[in-house]
Amino acid sequence: MAVMGIQMVVTLLVASLMQRVSPHYSFGRWLLCNGSLFRYKHPTEEELRTLAGKQKPKAKKERRTNGVAEEKPLTVPKDIDLRLDTQPINTMDALVLRYFLEYQWFIDFALYSTIIYLFTEAYYCVVDAQNEINIGVLWCLMSIIFSIKVLFTVMKHYFRSEEGGERSVCMTFAFFFLLIAMIVTIVRDEYLEFGLEPGLASVCHNLENFLAQQGWQWSMPFVKLAFKIALVALCAFLGGCLTFPGLRLAQTHLDALKMAADRPMLQLLLHMSFLPPVIVVVLWIRPITRDFLLNAPMGKESVELMSNSAYNTFRLWIIVLLCLLRFCLTRFHLQAYLCLADRWVEQMKREAGRISMLEIQRKISRIFCYLTVVALQYLAPVILTFHCVFMLKSLGDYSWGLYPEPPGFSPVVDSSPVQSHSPTSEEEEDTEDVQAAVEQIMGVLTSLRGLFTPLFFRGIFSFLTWWVSVCQIITSLFGLYFHQYLGAS
């Protein structure tokens, strides 16, 4: 409590509130069950028999002729005039959804993490609390970890598929993203301004001083190589996890545009919500954005449109606003997915032959049961990007523009020995031994905390934010091509 102060109090209050309020009111549950989304109900066997012109099966005694039971008809023509009834999604309907509890907990946790982060930002604006641990950063870090965990859980679902096609798609894209990440990590900062190399150099310098203080020797080039290998492996893993979310986003985007054919303003917003990954990627390409804005050509002269700190703030706000825009259009994408049931029925009517009643019911029910999976695929990348930006701002010592940006610094590990007083008695000797041990432990913890500089955090979270957008661009563009040309053929 003394270390974190009021932040710990607010954290405990929010955690208690989350535990007590979530069973009664859940933001994630409200997103699905507020009455704006409607599902298509599958037809009963009696309705299908009526549409097919078949009589109701006779009683069990009447169906036996010469000791042989008459088989129950299970198929109907595909071209029957089937029209699906709709019903708003309520809480009881949502309980049968796949991964509904995981979805509800994840969305609620992301919301409370954002609330705590906003509180800590306001607290840091009012109070000089630079020596306190920023508890909001810890919540954002957990949101990032849970976002990746949710995406991995959904990806594992595809790996359990019996057909194996989804598994091959994920592995192919993961290997493809591995190659791209290997290329990106060797691009100089003059083109992609992540700042990974300066940040890694500062960490290695502090680590070398820390190890020398402990009497250890370590090869710094090996540390840099191991870090880059781990970063490339993480990029490939994220690429595999973001494969099907990107493909699904492309499908729901096309379907949402068809639903909004008579609403041009909504179509404009849908197009704008599809472009955020492209804008985020461009924001870190130095010759196109920062160099242009800092030295904009005006005739024969160059004009500085904004400063370096102003551009950093501008980039943070742009990403936050784009994430909020995509979040606000969640309902239209989810409804576009639910309308796949009606589209499938219309496609079935244009085909010849017969189809099982059970298959019709199963297909329509399956679309609704996977609604939360689609919601996680849509919202998890948004939440991941959103909280990566929060981490970039706080740990990278950036500013929202509401107060001056603190200067970046690279703390050097202090190698001075811990001072201790000479004991005067046995009791004082024991007490001072404990104090010396505590001081030594605190000194080691302080040194470990000083290893990771704001320059390093700027590099790592800039890269992660940029990489998530790259994965979304590639997978969603491939999804557009697949659903428009390959899927339609």
From Swiss-Prot:
It holds the Pfam family Tmemb_161AB. The lineage of its organism: Eukaryota, Metazoa, Chordata, Craniata, Vertebrata. It is a multi-pass membrane protein. InterPro entries: Transmembrane_161A/B. The chain crosses the membrane at residues 99-119, 135-155, 167-187, 225-245, 265-285, 305-325, 371-391, 460-480. Keywords: Glycoprotein, Membrane, Signal, Transmembrane, Transmembrane helix. The keyword Transmembrane applies. Residues 413-432 are annotated as: Disordered. Residues 24-98, 156-166, 246-264, 326-370, 481-489 are extracellular. It is found in: Membrane. The keyword NADP does not apply. Residues 1-23 form the signal peptide. May play a role in protection against oxidative stress. GO terms for cellular component: membrane. It comes from Xenopus laevis. It comes from the Eukaryota. Belongs to the TMEM161 family. This is Transmembrane protein 161A. Glycans are attached at N34.
